[in-house]
Amino acid sequence: LFNTPLKPLLNWLDVIPVQRHAAQGLTQQIIAEIQKREQIWVGMTPEGTRHNATDFKRGFYHIALGAQVPIVMFAMDYAHKTIYCLGTFCPTGDYEADLEKILALYEGKISAKHPQRLAKPLQKH
């Protein structure tokens, strides 16, 4: 994206480019960026794709845990054209238990334009 006409906008928004194939690893790059800034917002989708994912990628969780920052959860309700902020969650290190608590917050808050493409963990909720 930084080699496109969007570059000035991305720079103005203070978007940080990441090197997906760097030796340090994407998760560690993001943790390092969070730790060296006084204030930062990192946005990502745990599905890691725009298509039907069977599981969440764990990077969002490991980034929050490693940087010692909360996860702020949002849900999109396509039917009502609404975005909900579901609150924050501080990871404990027990991914499976924490994921169940996180998914419970999405209960009844999601309606997708293409429900068949919704990530499997969210289809139950």
Task: Label each PLM-derived region with a short phrase.
Residues 1-108, 118-125:
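Soluble catalytic domains of membrane acyltransferases
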